[in-house]
Amino acid sequence: MQLRKILRLTDEERRLLARPAFIAGGIFAAILVAVILGIANPLDTVLVLDLRHSHPWTDGMFKILESPGQRRFVYPLAIVLSFVLTYRRRDLLPTITAVSALLFTNAVTGVFKLATLRGFPRRTGDPGVFNTDFGDLADLGAFPSGHATNVAAASTLLVLAAYSARPKFRPLATPITVITAIACFITFVSSWLRDTHWVTDLVAGFALGVCTTIVATLWALHLPDHWRHPELAGRPRIIIFTVGVLSLAAIFMFAANSFLSHSGTSILMVGATLGFIARQSHKGIQRAVARNRDDSAS
């Protein structure tokens, strides 16, 4: 691969990209408070239509339609697409961004599921949190919706990739945005009408997916060139990185949906992710200080 200039964002571009993350994060925080305080419970209860009992034939249909929210489908597809973009752009950024965003999103989602312990509408009529009456964690963990965070994270990655494409592919950005919006809407409606999640679970999930994905993207854009450029990264690092990414794709494709959401794995992943971010940020600060010293000396 020939050396190619690595994409870097200006401070203004980073602020512009961070704005949707702040908005989405604020929406998620507001819904979280409303759910914990029980303010959203009456609304959630009223919006349960119970179609799976009144019209049983709809359950199978909505189960198929909510497939974009299934991690085993959307995550491997996003990872494979990131590999294609990495090869075409001669930059590891697409794959690093996709993997870090999906992992971080999944881990944060799992932590909030474990922290809130909210029951699913299909299994209980009580939308309250901190419900310890269930003996099985599989009956809890409704907030936020994993279906919503999954499709929101993948859609955000697709939209970011579309708008950062080469000029000749830029006209595809609008159709891709429309398609992802439709996929999100179908997932929302299907999960709601199938009683997979409370409505606030779904809205919070979409907000969290957008927020965590953009945060991971901004972090990935700060990585040094030797982490992003295939030639500078070196063959051993490329091999280890490729094996790790393919292993994650296999886990997401074949593991049960509760693999990360209902176990301590989520907490470990968040800790590891934040630790890695802190380590890279510390190195980045050290490099910046060293550059300033060199500039001052010269």
Where are these regions (language model features)?
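Alpha-helical transmembrane segments in multi-pass membrane proteins
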Residues: T97-A101, T105, T109, G205, ...
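Hydrophobic alpha-helical transmembrane segments of integral membrane proteins
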Residues: I96-T124, A183-W198
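Hydrophobic alpha-helical transmembrane segments
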Residues: G69-R90, H147-A162
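N-terminal transmembrane-helix/juxtamembrane module of multi-pass inner/ER membrane proteins
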Residues: M1-A78, K113-G135, G284-S298
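Interfacial segments of alpha-helical transmembrane regions
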Residues: R19-I23, L81-V108, A173, T177
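Multi-pass membrane proteins that catalyze or facilitate reactions on polyprenyl-/lipid-phosphate substrates
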Residues: M1-I36, V210-S298
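Membrane-embedded catalytic cores of phosphoryl/pyrophosphoryl-handling enzymes
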Residues: G128-S266
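Membrane-water interface at transmembrane helix exits
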Residues: V35, V48, E66, T109-L117, ...
